Amino acid sequence: MSIISTQLNAIKPSPTLAVVRKTLELKRAGIDIIALGAGEPDFDTPDNIKEAAIKAIKDGFTKYTNVEGIPALKEAIQAKFKRENNIDYDLEEIIVSTGGKQVIYNLFMASLNKGDEVIIPAPYWVSYPDMVLLAEGTPVFANCGIESNFKLSGEALEQLITPKTKWLIINSPSNPTGASYSHSELKNIAEVLRKHPYVNVMSDDIYEHITFDGFKFYTLAEIAPDLKDRIFTVNGVSKAYSMTGWRIGYGAGSKALIKAMTIIQSQSTSNPCSISQVAAVEALNGVQGYIAQNALNFEKKRDLALSILQRVKYFECYKPEGAFYLFIKCDKIFGAKTKSGKVINNSNDFGEYLLEEAKVAVVPGIAFGLEGYFRISYATSMEELEEACLRMERACGSL
């Protein structure tokens, strides 16, 4: 009898973390690798947030807190939803966890029964399907390629709903594509949901504040307040405030769900880090002006990367409305031979080619559930980004 649970047989290690690990190994070996695989901002946590954390340490705020988060942070989250999204939540409808990932994990563990279906538009964030599988749910994938601007339409959603459907996942702006749902697109989805009262929605808004070209962000509970009790909204401080390592995410939904998720959290991690919670209060309540400036910097990086990569004859590029990724179609290169005679048959092969020939680390599209693409993160310096894109252009030009 194996000591490892059979439930883990269907679960794969994170492919994005695997790319990061491989990149670090090559760098340690002295190879000049430019990594475009990581999904975190390249700026530091603002000083006012750090100072709030230091004060919390000096004040001795280092003990257990409420499992679901300290009142001050839940109040800051409540105010954020009202101020930015025009949504009213009671404090009992809010939970704070150790990152947005734990919020989503707790949500599915609390709500899924064996065989319940979760509709996941592909490409998707790599952890969605595995978290559904761990909760004994069934992922149902909706292929949303570049021809549909990487977004799920109401009409396509209608075709996927069955009596077993329990959740739909919406991630806007999206990882890995940066595609973002407009007001009318969300309204279209809401119209379908009204016909199916047993279908709930998990809205992952973690990239909410990183949008470009004047794009106006909306979240589904804002568009369809009549569906609020069926919508669970996930957010956090990781991306907007560059606090990926602080591990604070939060969610808002029905009191019944929050209560169930709190029970799960109480028997796993207990409360999120007390010091990180104080830092998150300062993030949400403190000055916000730098967020727009950071988004503008990402927009400039997006434009730089596109200006180079659009020249590659094998690539088809989508101009994203947000986040800090490009998800580039590259299937025209399949069948090409490298100088060593190896045939590039899929996105994994192409990722390996770029790593070996261009010394650039990217993430193959198959990791996100859609073959024929690859993802780059442009959350790096302008100089490094330009060099990486030029290397990729040269590497493709030699095929």
From Swiss-Prot:
Q: Which residues carry this modification: N6-(pyridoxal phosphate)lysine?
A: 239
Question: Site Important for prephenate aminotransferase activity: which residues?
Answer: 12
What is any one GO biological process for this UniProt entry? biosynthetic process
Amino-acid positions noted as binding L-aspartate in the UniProt annotation, renumbered to this chain: 39, 125, 175, 375
What keywords are annotated for this sequence in UniProt?
A: Aminotransferase, Cytoplasm, Pyridoxal phosphate, Transferase
Q: Which Pfam families match?
A: Aminotran_1_2
- The portions of this protein that span the membrane are none
User: Which terms does the record give in the GO molecular function aspect?
Assistant: glutamate-prephenate aminotransferase activity; L-aspartate:2-oxoglutarate aminotransferase activity; pyridoxal phosphate binding
Q: Which cofactor does it need?
A: pyridoxal 5'-phosphate
Annotated catalysed reactions? L-aspartate + 2-oxoglutarate = oxaloacetate + L-glutamate; L-arogenate + 2-oxoglutarate = prephenate + L-glutamate
Against PROSITE patterns, the record matches this protein to: AA_TRANSFER_CLASS_1 (PS00105)
The record describes its quaternary structure and partners as: Homodimer.
Question: Family, per the entry?
Answer: Belongs to the class-I pyridoxal-phosphate-dependent aminotransferase family.
Name of the protein:
Probable aspartate/prephenate aminotransferase
Provenance organism: Rickettsia bellii (strain RML369-C)
